């Protein structure tokens, strides 16, 4: 019976440890900038006055992905997405839209 308690306590501690590790990974991913295939700390995010716009560079297994966060929505391709009236809009190649980053 005592052995069962030790196993349960051990499994619970592993579970808690994995949750804390995942939350630290998420925090670390949110403040990264891509440079030469490496993600580096980025102190600045883009917050424009017109809306809640953030450019976030994230390292996914050594590959840097850039997202545009617009009013709580995340657009997967920053180069083709922009925030218009609080919504993410995906523009076509070569198309210009107001308030879109170039």
UniProtKB/Swiss-Prot annotation:
It comes from the Eukaryota. Residues 1-28 form the signal peptide. It comes from Arabidopsis thaliana. One of its GO terms (biological process) is defense response to fungus. Belongs to the DEFL family. It is found in: Secreted. Keywords: Antimicrobial, Disulfide bond, Fungicide, Plant defense, Secreted, Signal. GO terms for cellular component: extracellular region. Disulfide bonds join 39-100, 64-83, 70-88, 75-90. This is Defensin-like protein 285.
